C-alpha cells in the first residue's frame, strides 16, 4: 500500500527587481563590443559580426570583398559612432579612431570625448558599449537609460513600468508620491478613494492594483486578480510530496 502526503507552501515576497537596459529601441538584444572576435569572420563570428582590419564588420557583407556604396553608408550609420564616407569608404572622422570610431585622440590616455567633456568611457554611469540593430549604443545599469546611459530613468528600478515606486529628482531617484521606505516599497496612500489598511490598498468598486490605480474593464464592478499583474509581489508555490510505502 502506498500513501502520499503533499504539502503546498504559498508565499508572497516583496521584490525590488531592477531592469538594466539590455535591448535597443527596437527590442533587439544589444551585443557587447567586447564579445565580438577580432580578426575572425568565420565560424567564430558573434551574431554575424567580427572586427576585421581594425573595423567592425557585418561578416556576410565583408566577405564579398567588393566596395559597396550602400554598405559603406550603412556601416557609418549603424556600425560606427563618429564616421563618414570618404572616397567611397566609411572612415573615422578627424581625431576619432577605433573599430567603431569612438576613441578620441584629443583626450588624455584612456579617455574619450562625450559631448564637450573628456570622460573615461563614451558610455556614462558604468555602461558598456554595444552594437544595436540601428546604431552603436550602450548597455546601461539601472536606473540609467538613453543611447549612452546619459538619461536618468527611475522606472528601471522597478520590475514593471506600471509601478510608480520611484520618480526622477534631478540626478537621482526618490520615492514616488504614494510610497516611502528605503526601497520605496511601503505604500503610504492610495488612489481613487482607496483605503490604506495594514499597508495595502483596499480598492473601491471599479478599481484594482497596488494603489487602486487601474480601472476594471468596462461593465465590470470588480476585477479578477488573475487578470491583473501584481508587480510588487513574487508568488512562489512549492509542492513537496512525501511518499510513504507500507509493505
UniProtKB/Swiss-Prot annotation:
- Protein name according to UniProt: EGF-like domain-containing protein C02B10.3
Mind giving the lineage of the organism this protein is from?
Answer: Eukaryota, Metazoa, Ecdysozoa, Nematoda, Chromadorea
Where can this protein be found? Membrane
Q: Name one GO biological process term.
A: Notch signaling pathway
The disulfide bridges present are 123-138, 140-149, 190-201, 203-212
Q: What GO molecular function annotations does the UniProt record carry, in alphabetical order?
A: Notch binding
Using the record, list the residue span of the signal peptide; answer none if the entry has no such feature.
Answer: 1-17
The EGF-like domain covers 114-150, 180-213
Q: Which residues lie on this side of the membrane: Extracellular?
A: 18-220
Q: Does the keyword Secreted apply?
A: no
- Organism whose genome encodes this protein: Caenorhabditis elegans
UniProt-annotated glycosylation sites, renumbered to this chain: 126
Keyword annotations: Disulfide bond, EGF-like domain, Glycoprotein, Membrane, Repeat, Signal, Transmembrane, Transmembrane helix
Ranges in the topological domain labelled Cytoplasmic: 241-247
Amino acid at each position: 500500500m502506498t500513501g502520499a502526503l503533499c504539502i503546498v507552501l504559498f508565499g508572497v515576497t516583496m521584490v525590488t527587481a531592477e531592469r538594466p537596459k539590455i535591448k535597443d529601441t527596437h527590442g533587439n538584444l544589444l551585443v557587447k563590443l567586447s564579445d565580438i572576435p577580432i580578426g575572425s569572420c568565420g565560424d567564430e563570428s558573434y551574431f554575424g559580426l567580427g572586427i576585421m582590419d581594425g573595423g567592425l564588420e557585418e561578416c556576410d557583407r565583408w566577405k564579398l570583398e567588393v566596395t559597396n556604396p550602400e554598405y559603406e553608408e550603412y556601416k557609418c550609420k549603424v556600425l560606427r559612432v563618429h564616421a563618414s564616407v570618404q572616397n567611397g569608404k566609411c572612415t573615422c572622422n578627424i581625431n576619432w579612431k577605433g573599430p567603431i570610431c569612438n576613441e578620441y585622440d584629443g583626450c588624455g590616455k584612456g579617455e574619450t570625448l562625450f559631448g564637450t567633456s573628456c570622460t573615461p568611457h563614451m558610455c556614462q554611469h558604468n555602461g558598456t558599449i554595444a552594437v544595436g540593430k540601428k546604431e552603436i549604443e550602450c548597455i546601461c545599469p539601472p536606473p540609467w537609460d538613453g543611447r549612452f546611459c546619459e538619461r536618468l530613468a527611475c522606472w528601471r528600478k522597478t520590475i514593471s513600468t506600471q509601478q510608480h515606486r520611484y520618480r526622477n529628482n534631478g540626478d537621482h531617484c526618490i520615492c514616488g508620491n504614494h510610497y516611502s521606505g528605503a526601497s520605496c516599497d511601503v505604500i503610504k496612500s492610495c488612489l481613487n478613494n482607496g483605503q490604506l489598511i495594514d499597508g495595502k490598498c483596499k480598492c473601491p468598486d471599479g478599481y484594482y492594483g497596488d494603489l487602486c490605480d487601474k480601472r476594471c474593464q468596462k461593465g465590470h464592478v470588480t476585477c479578477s486578480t488573475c487578470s491583473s499583474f501584481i508587480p510588487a509581489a513574487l508568488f512562489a508555490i512549492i509542492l513537496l510530496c512525501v511518499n510513504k510505502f507500507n509493505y
